[in-house]
């Protein structure tokens, strides 16, 4: 507690000069304010255009956009009669007449309700779909389910269709703007499940939306160079009993099934809600790697049979209009079995051929318990909120390895048990000091503990070259983070700004077999700043800055072997230190007739970069070890362009282009010989520098054929991508889809044919640690059939809760 008290006191000293900037607006001119909400859900409508026109409606006088909470305020209006309008894609335009005069210069319009736009087609009323991608001030929001391209078996299946996001189908690693240092959240909370596994376990039908926050403010935790990806799950709060049922079947080589049920009951002061989703199926994966100089090939065949179940139960208790208590729990259960075969063939010397078989049996359970209390004061937007989140994760993995041929290792089994605990407590205070100023203060405590137990029945070589029993390892990794933040912002007629600072005190310790292997303590300051210029309701320019950190993730510091093949093993490095990034962005949004265009540029300055290190195994010089290390400072930059446009009423287009460039540095070792029996004298160490520029292009077209039938076509192209390990060849695919609505729009049937030309595969070539080339294939060519049905009705008064980012940098790399 003394950590938080000290940090909070320091923040008050730093922010008091900014609080004095708050001032009252000019009362000689008119002011109008209010809040815009959705008619069906009663949720705030963020970033809707608010327009003030002349009395005859022919001239635009001024305007603005609503905040994320749906609030708006227009100032400095002269006396007179005006037309007030609120516009947003997918809604009817709201319009009313206003009179500004002496004694009536401060108008509170209260709640402005927007109704969904409807069209009459052949006598049947059809509700218009809202834009799939919403461009907000600090984030992009992708509405899953509004678009056939976001239909699939799991979160991992839909991520590649999202602008600036890429998922490696082989390893499950996710990247944002070409960088894997991205934080992934579920409902704004950390999950103890490793990200690659988490994306495969969440059924796509359980997801409401996905948010991309590329330059978060000081209110958010600073982890993640490239930003935050927040997966928002469904939660109902409609009056009465309501629900949604979804199910889908994907068929490639094997079949995969997912389904979800989303229910709620609200009456009076209570809202009870729950969600169940599952993802059950079999996956096939294969590939090969050719070592050019020694003329050998590794061939891989993998098969997985996985089952995951996700449960969410919660209750909101509205004590009165000022006090709300909420509780929810997420339970995630996973059971996976896999087997694989690795064949190493030496074409010039078949006597060295090796075949390794393995069987993997793993299961895990993640439990999350969350409590929240919110107190609203009399002033609109003035509140304090306390949240406590406790997360448990248990995992057991048993792997059985057997080899035939020239292998010198007897058959063996590996056993890995993992236990993780995280407790987070937040206290947040928000105060609109006046009509143009807003102050936010907060404290946070995060406590992590991870225990990994490893044992094996196998043998390994010691330093003398003798086979000895593989020692057991117990690795304990603890991290405590205490932080405080403050943000202050003001909004004027055309200009707005926000400044913030976050202070963190971090303590890290790691023990291997009860011996202290590593400790680290540091206190850092993370400033942020945003300046926004809105000359009119159609244009917006924003410049932002934030300082970020990438703390080494568990797999990057864990000395226990992550995976192994006959020629490759991967380990963590307990001596890694954090990587720091200064991130700069400029974004411009232009609203045009029937759509909008958003463009942006970003630049990152990176210190103590964490990247791959590739070593020759000293106990077997024909094998390679993958690990991580810190390297020299570097930088990265990129550009993004996205648009949504409706050229005619039955055709809408969503497109995006992103380009990023970064200089990467790493360490590699190679063998300077072709002798099949090399010595340590043949090892050559080299510091590698790679200049990489890569780009992605996505284009989605949606066609309204009839009142009930919609067709879609989606195309994706990823350019060549370089890294320390290899250069990845270009990749591309085309998906086609159709959707049919029934039961007066309450039900939908969806059909997707993905990767119709079967072109999506990962192919590469590289020089480290050996000259090699290869490719990997998965079930990208598949058919998806889905159905959803909603029932019940009622108005929504959803509990508004903050969304937070949490995570640490994950391991990664794959088996190349």
Predicted feature descriptions by range:
Residues 24, 37, 49-53, 87-89, ...:
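Short, acidic, small-residue-rich periplasmic hinge/interaction motif at the N-terminus
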Residues 75, 189-214:
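Short acidic/polar hinge/loop motifs at secondary-structure boundaries
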Residues 55-71:
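Short, acidic Ser/Thr/Gly-rich low-complexity loop/linker segments typical of extracellular
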Residues 254-281, 295-340, 365-367:
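Transmembrane beta-barrel wall of Gram-negative outer-membrane proteins
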Residues 232-245, 285-288, 308-313, 322-325, 394-396, 507-508, 537-583, 603-626, ...:
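Surface-exposed extracellular loop regions of Gram-negative outer-membrane beta-barrel proteins
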Residues 413, 422-426, 466-473, 478, ...:
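Outer membrane beta-barrel strand-and-loop segments of large Gram-negative receptors
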Residues 111-113, 155-158, 174, 197-198, ...:
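N-terminal periplasmic accessory domains that precede
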